[in-house]
Amino acid sequence: GISIMKIVEELDSGPVCNAYKLKLENNYNAKKISEKLSLLAAEKILDNIDDILEDKAKFIEQDHSKATYAKKIEKKEGQIDWKLGASIIIGKINGLFPIPGAFFSFNGERYKILKAELGNGIGDAGEVISDNLEVACGNNESIKILEIQRQGKNPQKISEFMLGSKIKKGSIIF
């Protein structure tokens, strides 16, 4: 969500007059959430600006004991651990899109997964279990990769990517 707050010297510490939540859909990635939050912020600042300018807004101090700090996400955190459950992996793919992105390696090359959904196949974690790049995960789950980007190349739908790919059913990806 977003908060309408006074700016003070410390990061995110000013008093808040209003806070708004955003309903998230399962298929939202970080980029989509950022876009939605930007639109919500633009709308809500307009709703609050008159009260703020006329000193009618009621600002309340934040409870600083509940404050948290998110450290910078490092590129290496995008490496997929196929032993994790499919929902966790899809969460990582969506949460790290577009930058730094969630990725795997095959034959020394990096592949960024841009979009994926839950699959229904079973195999060993990291094993490609279909000709359409469905990959086995932990908990006897799988994900279907829908869009991918090979290092240094343009993004591709999986049907297009698989035409020239060396990643085949039975391959193990890391």
State each model region's role.
Residues K23, Q79, Q151:
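Short, flexible active-site loop motifs that bind/organize anionic cofactors or intermediates
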